[in-house]
Amino acid sequence: MADMKVPALAGLKSVPPLTNPIVISDVHLAPNRPALMTAFLKFLERIAPRYAELVVTGDLFDYWLGDDAMLGPDASADVDAIVSSLRLYTSNGHRTLIMPGLHDCLLGRDFTDACGAELVADPIVINVMGTSVLFSHGAQWCTKDEALQAYRAVVTSPQWQSSVLRLPAGERAKMFGEAWKAASESHPEEISDKDRDIVESAAAESARAAGAQIVLHGHTHRPGAHVNAMIERWTLPDWNIDPETQHNKSGWITFLEGGRPQIQLF
C-alpha cells in the first residue's frame, strides 16, 4: 500500500476561492539555469506581490528527486533561496498553491510546508472570482502521445513514487530514466508535433465532469486561448531565460473582474 504522504496522494482536492490570483507554469528551475533563477526570484519580489494568490500548475522545477533529498542540510543555495522567497511571499499575507508536474512529480508536502504554501492535486477545480476554473498541469490530455501517457502513468503512480522515495537519493534519477526508456520502447512510433498537443475532447470531458467553466493548464509550452464549442481552454507559457542565446521568455495568466483570464507574455 502506498504511503499517503507521497505527492500523488498528498495534494489537496479542494481549496477556498481565489480572489485575485496570478498563475504560472513550467518555470523549470535548475542549478544550471542561474539567469532563470534570478528572473523567478525577481518575479516573486516585484510581480507576485501585486496579487493575492500565486498558483503554480506544475514543473516549477526541471527535476525534483524528493523533498528529503532536495531540502534540509543538503539543500542547494538555489533551493534555499526559492523556499525563503516563497515563505516571505506567504508570510506577507499571500496564498501560494503548488501543483506537481511531470518534471517535479516528487514535489511534496514537506516542500510546500517549508514555503508556507499548499500542495494541490492535479486536476483541481477552484472558484476564481466567481468562475469555476479547472487547473491542471495538462499532460493527461495529450492522449495521442502514447509514450508520454505510459510514462506519466508510471511516475504519477502512488506505488511507484512510494518505492522510489525509499531508495537512496542518488538512485532516483536512474528510475526516472528507466521509466521513460520503457515507455518510449513500448510506443516507438513517431508522432507529429500537433499530436503532442492537448486533445480538446479530453480536456472538455474533464471540465464537464468537474463542472468547470474554464480549463487552465501548462505542459505544452504553447501559450494562448483556445475557445470552441467544446471548451474554453487557456494554456500557460513556459519560462526560458538564456543570456547566451538571448532566448528569453516568460509569462503568466491573471484574471479580470468576473474571473476572465488574460495572458501576459514577456
Regions found by a protein language model. Name each.
Residues 23, 56, 127-128, 226-227, ...:
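Generic beta-strand structural signal
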Residues 52-57, 86-90, 128-131, 163-170, ...:
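Short C-terminal domain-edge/linker segments immediately following a structured domain
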Residues 2-8, 12, 17-20, 29-128:
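Core catalytic region of metal-dependent phosphoesterases/phosphodiesterases
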Residues 114-122, 132-134, 139, 144-150, ...:
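Conserved beta-sheet core of the metallophosphoesterase superfamily
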Residues 136-199:
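Active-site-proximal loop/helix segment associated with metal-binding centers of metalloenzymes
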Residues 23-25, 54-58, 95-102, 135-136, ...:
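Active-site neighborhood of phospho(di)ester-bond hydrolases with catalytic His/Asp-centered motifs
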Residues 27-40, 147-157:
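Short charge-dense sequence patches
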